[in-house]
Regions:
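Short, basic, glycine/proline-bearing loop/turn elements
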Residues: 30-40
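Catalytic cores of nucleic-acid endonucleases
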Residues: 39-85
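Charged, structured surface patches that assemble and position nucleic-acid processing machinery
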Residues: 78-99
Length: 99
């Protein structure tokens, strides 16, 4: 699959997951699966994960599959899952523990 830019990734994942823009603006998108941020480049990964940290429920980042080896370490210990633009789960998300 060719590398996608941010707009193409948002369009693709929105179609696959029936995701809509987050009305509160805390994440890029919201779907039945939870909050979703899009990281089209490796440089956007850290910020995308950090913006999801305070949110409750399942949290996901969408990446180009070629960025998996960069995204994996960025999500360690965060319980944030990783999806590709087709909706394929590259790393499962988990619910944050209650504090």
């Amino acid at each position: 699959m060719a590398r996608m830019d941010r707009d193409a990734m948002i369009a693709a994942i929105s179609t696959v997951l029936a995701a809509t823009p987050d009305p509160e603006g805390t994440s890029d998108l919201v779907a039945e699966r939870g909050h979703i941020n899009v990281a089209a480049t490796a440089a956007e990964l850290k910020g995308a994960v950090q913006r999801l940290a305070p949110l409750r429920g399942y949290r996901w980042i969408v990446i180009n599959a070629g960025d998996l080896f960069t995204a994996g370490p960025a999500t360690l210990g965060t319980k944030v899952g990783i999806l590709d633009p087709t909706g394929r789960v590259l790393k499962a998300a988990d619910l944050p523990r209650a504090k």
